[in-house]
């Protein structure tokens, strides 16, 4: 029996369970929930999924969504 889990991995290396499946270039909030576009303001804390990896451990398959934090200039194009 194989267990499947999903994690979001923050730029500092911390991680938490992902609330849902994500895609490359998807914008998410600090809890891993997708943000609705257009954004209300560029002054929010947002991350972008830039890489997805899968690793196998004993009896478990872990999908990791690696995030990068977006700055004000990056977020302005989503407003």
Residue ranges and their predicted role:
Residues 1-12:
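Short, basic/aromatic beta-hairpin or loop at an interaction surface
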Residues 6-7, 51, 65:
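Polar/charged side chains located within well-ordered beta-strands of beta-rich proteins
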Residues 10, 29, 55-57:
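Acidic surface patches and DE-rich sequence motifs
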Residues 11-19, 72-79:
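Short, surface-exposed beta-strand/loop "edge" segments at domain boundaries and coil↔beta transitions
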Residues 18-40:
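Short coil-to-beta transition motif at edge beta-strands of beta-rich domains
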Residues 24, 43-45, 61-63:
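A generic structural signal for short beta-strands and their flanking turns/coil linkers
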Residues 39-54:
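Short beta-strand-centered aromatic/proline hotspots
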Residues 57-79:
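Short solvent-exposed strand/turn elements
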